[in-house]
């Protein structure tokens, strides 16, 4: 089932998520690049109406002495047939295409960079994203991660928006399995119809991890987060979040999180 994911470490966001049922060939070495191709489709949704994707990627393209380029191209389309019991044919779905370019730069400004651009289109809905992630060590015991992203979503009937996000985290090894983390982030969403929404969050966490490095896993964190948002953001609250915060424009949460990799 697993094929490929490309994510930002600080906020666990998947820039590319080619994960699903299918088959493919990975990392065919052509010298200048390693090429991977797969056919992905989930036939468990409906017997007569499915959607397939053809993820194609070229990685390890040496564009800089200290950096590499990865290119992702993913076309998608509908596969359908008439239901032989009801004699109803599924409604047409638009074709899709996604193109992503991701450049790594190591050792610049004392750290490692991931610079990305992605554009995808399905019918009348379009998304464009630019992202920069930076990772470094402030001291032998403290790691720093910073991420900034800007998205433009275009959709019919003023259904799109523009989204700016920026955040940073420090992760300090205190001794033994114990760590201390600080995070700060800000999001701004400008919908095509409606007022601009803003939210700023601050988090402090104490953690115990199986290793000295920031990426050591498994880890358990006890965290406290305080967030501040404006009236436009408050009006979008729903469900349990609205039940808890109501007409407030700030709030605090505390929790425990466990994480492991394999």
Locate the predicted segments by residue.
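Generic domain-boundary/flexible-linker signal
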Residues: 82, 157, 193, 215-217, ...
């Amino acid at each position: 089932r697993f094929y490929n994911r490309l994510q930002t470490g600080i906020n666990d966001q998947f820039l590319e998520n080619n994960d699903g049922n299918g088959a493919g060939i990975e990392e065919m070495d052509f010298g200048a690049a390693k090429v991977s191709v797969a056919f992905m489709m989930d036939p468990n949704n409906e017997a007569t109406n499915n959607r397939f994707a053809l993820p194609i990627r070229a990685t390890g393209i040496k564009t800089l002495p200290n950096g590499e380029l990865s290119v992702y191209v993913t076309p998608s389309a509908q596969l359908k047939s008439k239901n032989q019991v009801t004699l109803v044919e599924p409604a047409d779905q638009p074709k899709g295409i996604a193109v992503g370019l991701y450049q790594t730069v190591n050792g610049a400004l004392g750290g490692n960079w991931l610079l990305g651009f992605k554009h995808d289109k399905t019918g009348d809905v379009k998304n464009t994203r630019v992202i920069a992630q930076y990772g470094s060590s402030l001291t032998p015991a403290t790691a720093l991660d910073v991420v900034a992203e800007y998205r433009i979503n275009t959709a019919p009937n003023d259904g799109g928006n523009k989204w700016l996000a920026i955040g940073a985290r420090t992760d300090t090894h205190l001794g033994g399995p114990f760590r201390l983390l600080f995070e700060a982030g800000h999001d701004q969403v400008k919908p095509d119809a409606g007022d601009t929404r803003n939210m700023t969050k601050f988090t402090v966490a104490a953690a115990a991890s199986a290793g000295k490095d920031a990426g050591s896993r498994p880890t358990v964190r006890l965290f406290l987060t305080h967030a501040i948002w404006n009236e436009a953001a408050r009006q979008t609250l729903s469900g349990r979040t609205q039940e808890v915060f109501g007409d407030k424009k700030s709030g605090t949460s505390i929790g425990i999180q466990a994480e492991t990799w394999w």
